[in-house]
A protein has these predicted regions:
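Extended, composition-driven regions rather than compact fold-specific motifs
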Residues: 10-13, 36, 71, 98, ...
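Catalytic beta-strand/loop cores that center a nucleophilic Ser/Cys/Thr
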Residues: 18, 25-32, 51, 119-194
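Solvent-exposed loop/turn segments at secondary-structure junctions
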Residues: 13-15, 61-64, 93-97, 199-201
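A glycine-rich, often tryptophan-bearing local segment used as a flexible ligand/cofactor-contacting loop or short
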Residues: 65-142
Length: 224
């Protein structure tokens, strides 16, 4: 019998918004989540792939006056992914290990910071209310996602696509149509789902936003 899925959720304070913490508070009644903020010791554990069924991030490496996760954390996360395990990346987490070339190449669409090691122009985030819509796609997860009318919040646009990805949700703004949720398969066969909405507390706690995150978690922890 498959026991309760164990989830490790590592977040930074995200510029004082505590976005990861806010999402954790909404998810904790439904899932078994080991949450840590601004503390990467949880990532240096041996055998993350044995202990956890899912790794979640809401962090951008080296921001918020918190040192980036170090080389040991990086290696343990890589070992977890090399075991074919799934990962859920929230908001800017495609840049969790942005200094590492191997990481940048596997996350699908990635948030590009200034002084990008690969030389791409930075991504941007206009702030205004926006509608996140389920993509026109036969991906099974799309049947379990819902459109969300977000309050004024950061809209992540102009990300760089570093590998093939299936778009699950989009938004259309005056700048164009951009992916807001997407899946990519790692070189080791594991699933990575990214969900970009969720900076301000009101956006993170939006019931539609929480429901989408719950659906993504269920998808990622369900054995195929």
């Amino acid at each position: 019998l498959h026991g309760v899925a164990m989830i490790l959720f590592a977040a930074d304070n995200h510029y004082g918004t505590h976005a990861g913490q806010n999402l954790f508070e909404c998810l904790r009644p439904h899932h078994e989540i080991h949450f840590r903020e601004d503390d990467w010791r949880c990532l240096v554990e041996e055998n993350l792939a044995v202990t956890y069924d899912l790794l979640m991030f809401h962090l951008i490496g080296g921001t918020c006056d918190v040192p980036a996760p170090g080389p040991v954390a990086e290696q343990q996360v890589k070992k977890y992914l090399q075991a074919g395990k799934p990962m859920f990346l929230l908001h800017g987490s495609s840049a969790a290990f942005w200094q590492c070339a191997w990481w940048r190449s596997i996350v699908g669409f990635r948030w590009v910071r200034k002084d990008d090691p690969d030389g791409f122009t930075p991504s941007s985030h206009p702030i205004r209310p926006y509608l996140v819509e389920v993509a026109k796609s036969r991906h099974p997860l799309c049947q379990h996602l819902q459109d969300v009318a977000q309050p004024a919040d950061e809209i992540y646009i102009n990300l760089e696509q570093s590998c093939p990805a299936t778009t699950l949700m989009t938004t259309t703004t005056e700048e164009g149509t951009f992916p807001m949720a997407y899946e990519t398969i790692t070189p080791w066969g594991g699933k990575i789902v990214s969900y970009l909405p969720g900076h301000a507390p009101t956006a993170v706690r939006h019931p539609g936003n929480v429901a989408n995150c719950r659906s993504i978690i269920e998808y990622l922890i369900t054995p195929t």
